[in-house]
From Swiss-Prot:
The keyword Mitochondrion does not apply. One of its GO terms (cellular component) is spindle microtubule. InterPro entries: Kinetochore_Nuf2_N, Nuf2_N_sf. It is found in: Nucleus; Chromosome, Centromere, Kinetochore. GO terms for biological process: cell division; chromosome segregation. Acts as a component of the essential kinetochore-associated NDC80 complex, which is required for chromosome segregation and spindle checkpoint activity. The gene is NUF2. Pfam families: Nuf2. The keyword NADP does not apply. This is Probable kinetochore protein NUF2. Keywords: Cell cycle, Cell division, Centromere, Chromosome, Coiled coil, Kinetochore, Mitosis, Nucleus. It comes from Candida glabrata (strain ATCC 2001 / BCRC 20586 / JCM 3761 / NBRC 0622 / NRRL Y-65 / CBS 138).
Length: 460
């Protein structure tokens, strides 16, 4: 038990304590109840205190835990309801209240609060605990105006935190959608790459064919020019021959042989001219067909280039999408790690608090055992002293009135002393049994709670 000199707050007397508590809207605070506290009274008063200063209650915490278990366990909902509504409900409420009170009183300057302060409250400890509450209320009232700025900042940070959680959920949904699309993308990407390879092969073939046709077309143009020059030359020759023919027609008929020879030459040249004209027409038809083929090939090549551009655009978009996915995965993974670390640290903190409370309870139990052992030794010593005194009295009185002492006084005193000793022993044994019963019940509930908590953590 801590002494007043170890506390950071003053120990108030009952009258001042009651006035301060009633000014804080705790109407049930009276001198009589605080001077002789009962378990039911301090439990009700502490519930009002933590609900007023912390804004929570054991029932609310249990309801939230029940709702959380129903959401996470699914089919095991009936088991959770039985655990919270069954015979353990009152015990869970007391453990929850003890945990909340331990944290609250630790914050206001008391580090040795334990469950005994709820089940078997002492007047001095109750007065000390309530003095800490009054000191905290005074400090809170004095510093409330200084905390307005921090309250505003806290609200802004809470709003920002909610916004971040909304952004996180949105990014998580986007990541899920992208991952779903990403599972389908590899197959489509492979198909596009395969089609792209086929189109590239066809494009190479068409490019080679285009080059070959271009060479043939250039050769054709050169040959056409040569034929046109030859045709022009033959035309000039024909014109000259026609001119000569006209001049020769003026000669007399004696030159019939020469005329026949000239006519034959003219016919031969005319026939050759017709052949050249037919060949030129055929070449022009081939050129027209070749132009149509070249135009068709150019259109096909342009179409293939358009397809390649589209494929390149799709590949670039897929690459950008993959980069965006990688960029989003990094922050999301980091946020997930931070949230996981935060949850693990919170669970470890709760486990440490329970472990600390268990250590305090074990220390209190050891102290009670030591007091019991010490009181037992004192009782044995007292019995031995009484027996010694009794023996001395009997020895002295036996010399004076042995028959009277044996029949009357000795039996009467022995019965009275034996009755008193039996009453003291029975009362002491009852107190020890009650303490051991409460301690074993507490340890059992704590073990069950820790097992269920560990099971819940493993399930998560």
């Amino acid at each position: 038990m801590a002494t007043p000199t170890q506390d950071i707050f003053p120990l108030l007397d009952l009258e001042e304590l009651v006035i301060c508590l009633q000014s804080c809207d705790f109407a049930m605070a009276t001198e009589e109840h605080i001077a002789r506290p009962t378990s039911q009274y301090v439990i009700t008063l502490y519930k009002q205190i933590i609900e007023n200063f912390m804004g929570i209650s054991p029932e609310q915490v249990l309801a939230e835990q029940l709702s959380s278990r129903q959401n996470t366990e699914g089919n095991d909902e009936s088991t959770s309801v039985d655990m919270f509504d069954g015979p353990y409900r009152e015990t869970l409420q007391m453990l929850t209240l003890n945990k909340i009170c331990y944290k609250f009183f630790e914050n206001v300057g008391i580090n040795d609060f334990n469950i005994v302060d709820l089940y078997k409250p002492e007047a001095y400890r109750t007065r000390r605990l309530l003095s800490a509450v009054v000191n905290y209320a005074r400090f809170r009232e004095e510093r409330m105006f200084d905390c307005n700025q921090f309250i505003i900042q806290m609200e802004e940070m809470l709003d920002e935190l909610k916004s971040k959680f909304d952004d996180f959920n949105y990014l998580k949904a986007q990541l899920t959608a992208i991952e779903d699309d990403d599972e389908k993308t590899p197959g489509e990407l492979e198909d596009l790459l395969q089609k792209n390879k086929v189109l590239e092969t066809n494009l190479k073939k068409l490019t080679i064919l285009q080059e070959k046709l271009s060479i043939d077309y250039n050769n054709y143009k050169m040959k056409k020019q040569e034929l046109l020059r030859e045709l022009e030359k033959n035309s000039f020759t024909l014109i000259e021959l026609e001119s000569k023919k006209e001049r020769l027609m003026n000669y007399n008929d004696d030159d019939q042989d020469l005329q026949n020879s000239l006519n034959n030459s003219i016919d031969r040249l005319t026939e050759e001219k017709k052949k050249q004209i037919g060949y030129v027409s055929k070449l022009e038809g081939n050129v027209s067909n070749l132009k149509v083929t070249v135009d068709t090939l150019e259109k096909a090549i342009e179409h293939i280039y358009d397809i390649l551009r589209l494929l390149s655009t799709d590949l670039q978009e897929s690459h950008r999408a993959e980069l965006n996915i990688e960029g989003i995965k990094g922050p999301l993974t980091e946020k997930r790690t931070r949230l996981k670390n935060l949850l693990e640290s919170n669970v470890i903190y709760k486990y440490d608090v329970l472990k600390e409370q268990l250590n305090v309870a074990e220390t209190e139990y050891q102290r009670i055992n030591e007091e019991h052992y010490r009181e037992t030794l004192e009782n044995k010593k007292l019995i031995q002293e009484l027996e010694g005194k009794y023996n001395n009295i009997i020895h002295n009185k036996m010399q004076e009135a042995e028959v009277y002492i044996e029949n009357e006084i000795t039996e009467k005193k022995i019965k009275i002393l034996q009755s008193e000793l039996n009453d003291i022993q029975i009362q002491f044994n009852n107190e020890i049994d009650n303490i051991e019963l409460h301690y074993s019940t507490l340890v059992g509930h704590i073990n069950n709670y820790m097992k269920k908590l560990i099971t819940a953590l493993n399930n998560h």
